[in-house]
Curated annotation (Swiss-Prot):
Positions with a binding annotation for Zn(2+): C187, H189, C212, C217
Ranges annotated as SP-RING-type zinc finger: 156-242
Protein name, UniProt field: E3 SUMO-protein ligase NSE2
Pathway(s) this gene product operates in, as recorded in its UniProt entry: Protein modification; protein sumoylation
Organism: Bos taurus
Key words, A-Z: Acetylation, Cell cycle, Cell division, Chromosome, DNA damage, DNA recombination, DNA repair, Isopeptide bond, Metal-binding, Mitosis, Nucleus, Phosphoprotein, Telomere, Transferase, Ubl conjugation, Ubl conjugation pathway, Zinc, Zinc-finger
Modified residues (Phosphoserine): S118
Single Gene Ontology BP annotation: double-strand break repair via homologous recombination
Any single GO CC term annotated in Swiss-Prot or TrEMBL for this entry: chromosome, telomeric region
Source lineage: Eukaryota, Metazoa, Chordata, Craniata, Vertebrata
Transmembrane segments: none
Assembly with partners or alone: Component of the SMC5-SMC6 complex which consists at least of SMC5, SMC6, NSMCE2, NSMCE1, NSMCE4A or EID3 and NSMCE3.
E.C. code: 2.3.2.-
Keyword Cell cycle: yes
Length: 248
């Protein structure tokens, strides 16, 4: 809660208003974002486990539903943080002697942001998008596509599909089957984590741009931040190895 300050030159205050308490509370709220992030990681991992073991659960315990709820919490928290920070910045710029109703100002800004909510917002949530992509890819590996997706692949040579899947297991740098695959968010290609990290670091040390090593790819300025763990592919590779051992 904001309080009165006897010195207008104190750090974190403007006029008679001190924002140190508000900013401290903001910092605490930001740590809650990591809890939401961890929850999304757990829900994603459980969802992939369910696909891998082909376990059916009721809609009440759907991981898709859990991920949507986490994404909604993340959006709401981001809106609240944005509303508070925007209000603080505005009051500091105004430098008014009169103490405004900060709670009312924050609520107005927060509601304005919430009123703009749409399902399209989830496309900006990296973990949610990654979850949907990996779930779709793993279902495809196990032949669990939706009817619509299955219709698209119906009639396609099964051996060709298997061969294509196995080709996707090969790192374009090492030319070996991947153990810890990472995906490039920009172009969608996958690589062995250690190999691509070493390649990017080597290029950047020489002040050069790192190009995607996949032949024909137009992504010519790779960053470490472009890489994300490809959990679905890792599981597919492990499953492929297991089947291969069982057939020998």
């Amino acid at each position: 809660m904001p309080g009165r300050s006897t010195s207008s030159s104190s750090s974190g205050s403007t006029g008679f208003i001190s924002f140190s308490g508000v900013e401290s509370a903001l910092s605490s709220l930001k740590t809650f974002q990591s809890c939401i992030s961890s929850g999304m990681d757990t829900a994603s991992s459980v969802a992939l486990d369910l696909v891998e073991t082909q376990t059916e659960v009721s809609s009440e315990y759907s991981m898709d539903k859990a991920m949507v709820e986490f994404a909604m919490m993340d959006r709401e928290l981001n809106h609240y943080l944005k509303a508070v920070q925007s209000t603080i910045n505005h009051v500091k710029e105004e430098r008014s002697e009169k103490i405004p109703d900060l709670k009312l100002l924050v609520e107005k800004k927060f509601l304005a942001l919430q009123n703009k909510n749409s399902d399209a917002d989830f496309q900006n949530n990296e973990k949610f998008v990654q979850f949907k992509q990996q779930l779709k890819e793993l279902k495809k590996q196990y032949g669990l596509q939706s009817d619509r997706e299955a219709d698209i692949t119906e009639g396609v040579d099964e051996d060709m599909i298997v061969t294509q899947s196995q080709t996707n297991f090969i790192c374009p740098i090492t030319q070996l089957e991947m153990k810890k695959p990472v995906k490039n968010k920009v172009c969608g290609h996958t690589y062995e984590e250690e190999a691509i990290v070493r390649m990017i670091e080597s290029k950047h040390e020489r002040k050069k741009k790192a190009c995607c090593p996949k032949i024909g790819c137009s992504h010519v300025d790779m960053r470490m931040s472009d890489l994300i763990q490809d959990e679905a592919l890792r599981r597919a590779i492990e499953s492929h190895k297991k089947r291969r051992r069982q057939s020998n």
